[in-house]
Amino acid sequence: MNVKIEPLPTFKREAKRLNKHYASFADDYERFINELEANPHLGTDLGGGLRKIRMAITSKGKGKSGGARVITFTVVVAVEESEINLLYIYDKAERSSISKKEIEELLRLNGLK
């Protein structure tokens, strides 16, 4: 399967903030992208093409459980081709979860709904 991964503006803004805060973030993000390319079905299925994936932040020293959460939205382009939109990322230490309403707003802000 051919997978294209596209970080959206709402994701980029939060990723930039986390990158300033955690020294290992750039390497952790690269590792996350490689894992996602190898297995596009990572994480928990939230329905409607949405997934929540745990991402470790090495400099926090807490593994995936205390790292970040990435919300993705997958669009199937063709039978063997899909696009994974990186919708949002948040630090698990800053917030425990994200509501369905917030996810819908993120989709709207990025022109996906």
Describe the residue ranges of each PLM region.
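Arg/Lys-rich, positively charged N-terminal/basic patches that mediate binding to nucleic acids
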Residues: M1-Y29
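Residues at secondary-structure transition points
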Residues: N2, K62-S65, I98
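Alpha-helix N-cap and coil->helix boundary residues
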Residues: E6, S24-D28, D45, S82, ...
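Alpha-helix C-capping/helix-to-loop hinge sites
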Residues: E14-H21, N39, A56, Y90-A93
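Compact soluble domain cores
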Residues: S24-L42
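Basic/aromatic recognition patch in beta-strand/loop cores that engages polyanionic ligands
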Residues: H41-L87
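Enriched for short, Lys/Arg-rich terminal
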Residues: F73-K113
